[in-house]
Amino acid sequence: MDASHPAVYPVGVPPTAVDPPPRVRMKDYEGMPSTLGGLVLRSGQFACAVTALSIMISIPDFSSVTAFCYLVAAMALQLLWSVSLAVVDGYALLLRRTLHNPVLLSLLVIGDWVTSTLSLAAACSSAGITVLIDSDLAQCAHNHCGRYEAAVAMAFLTWFLVSLSFFFSFWLLATR
């Protein structure tokens, strides 16, 4: 019985690499730090915070309610945070650099988390007072309910944009 025998042809073995090849990251998504989307998010946060702050400051007696004072303070902090990070994002875009340093990303994540929490708390407390004045006390004729509602809406929009920035930064930090 003749069985066929496999023929063995010598094949050169490729040299083994000392270091494994670098991991290939997926492309950076718009909205992450040092992208154009990130700059747009920061600019939107700034614009919404400025609008909410301007509306509240234009109301003469806003300081009589603690929740409205808290909204003004939270939007002022958000304004400073957003404009400073918009400048950093713009500078990184001009130099074509990435902001993927783990220490810097940790700072961005913690800062966005704190400012988004403050913005949400301020927006919710101000919305509660606005509903109280409008619906429960029915004193909109004596107060500026339309302005209060507009400022609260801008505060919620600010919170939404900051939350998006937080999630993009956190995602980038978690996948490093």
Swiss-Prot record:
Cellular compartments annotated: Cell membrane
Location, primary (coarse class): membrane
Spans within the Cytoplasmic topological domain: 1-45, 89-102, 173-176
Cystine pairings recorded for this chain: none
Extracellular topological domain residue ranges: 67, 124-151
Sequence similarity: Belongs to the Casparian strip membrane proteins (CASP) family.
Name of the molecule in the record: CASP-like protein 5A1
